[in-house]
């Protein structure tokens, strides 16, 4: 059995179980956090959403918003996590179709059936364990998933070919796979927003991108990111999520929380933007 060991425990989040639980508790209770483990539902059903993936001390309070919102809809049968491939290693679009992911909170199993369905409907995705070896965009979501939902299965996907066409192809394949799977699935697009600019600039640029996401406009998102040089690391995963939402009829999008690393750290000269955005109907 393939075991994906933690790559960023002790860096992005605590490597010890109790300290990790305390860090997630801190994220929820933080002045920028949701203050509750479970939020009232916005509509009848949720698809998932956009969630940041920085170190917990920076983006944890914002990330907690999406998880607390999803907790209001209940535990899913599986969670698909689509993140960027920051290191550019492995396949252009990679999935891990078997094995487990390990964190200080224990192990979660990959849902092989759902992963196989995605691969069946998109020939551009490859089963590539190596592509995940260093990648934090998926890893940092898993302790939150374990904290909120326990032993739910996951399907990890990372993308370094972040084009509009790739997002559309992947999104349509995932939507088809979810339909055929026939059970309750959440989809997470793991992404931070604008990088390493002053707080005011990051807020302004993020707002332009978020406005396109709220309009369920993947083409507009890619266009504004290119035109205004908005350095969104998970542009492709967000684009895929928008396509999945369109295909499955989740037309309502709600911005739960937007902040920057300057809000959590106090250092506002060079910041990274974070947003939790819920897709629902």
From Swiss-Prot:
Family statement drawn from the similarity comment of this UniProt entry: Belongs to the MEMO1 family.
SUPFAM superfamilies: LigB-like (SSF53213)
Protein's organism: Pyrobaculum arsenaticum (strain DSM 13514 / JCM 11321 / PZ6)
Listed InterPro entries: MEMO1_fam
Origin: domain of life: Archaea
Signal peptide: none
Pfam families per UniProt: Memo (PF01875)
Gene3D superfamilies hit by this protein: LigB-like
Designated name of the protein: MEMO1 family protein Pars_0062
């Amino acid at each position: 059995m393939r075991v994906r060991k933690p790559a960023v425990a002790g860096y992005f989040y605590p490597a010890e179980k109790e300290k990790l639980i305390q860090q997630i508790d801190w994220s929820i209770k933080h002045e920028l956090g949701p203050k509750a483990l479970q939020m009232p539902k916005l509509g009848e059903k949720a698809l998932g959403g956009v969630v940041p993936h920085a170190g917990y001390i920076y983006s944890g309070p914002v990330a907690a918003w999406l998880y607390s919102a999803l907790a209001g809809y209940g535990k899913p049968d599986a969670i698909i996590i689509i993140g960027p491939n920051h290191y550019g290693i492995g396949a252009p679009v990679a999935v891990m179709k078997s094995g487990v992911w390990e964190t200080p909170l224990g192990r979660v199993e990959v849902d092989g059936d759902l992963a196989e369905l995605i691969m069946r409907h998109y020939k551009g995705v490859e089963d590539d364990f190596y592509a995940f070896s260093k990648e934090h965009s998926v890893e940092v979501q898993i302790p939150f998933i374990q904290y909120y939902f326990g032993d739910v299965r996951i399907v990890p996907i990372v993308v370094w070919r972040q084009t509009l066409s790739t997002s559309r192809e992947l999104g349509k394949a995932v939507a088809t796979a979810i339909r055929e799977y026939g059970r309750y699935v959440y989809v997470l697009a793991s992404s931070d927003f604008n990088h390493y600019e002053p707080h005011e600039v990051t807020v302004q640029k993020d707002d332009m991108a978020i406005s396109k996401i709220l309009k369920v406009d993947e083409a507009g998102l890619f266009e504004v990111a290119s035109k205004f040089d908005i350095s969104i690391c998970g542009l492709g995963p967000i684009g895929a999520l928008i396509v999945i939402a369109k295909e499955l009829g989740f037309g309502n999008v709600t911005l739960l929380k937007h902040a920057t690393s300057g809000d959590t750290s106090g250092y506002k000269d060079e910041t990274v933007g974070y947003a939790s955005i819920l897709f629902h109907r």
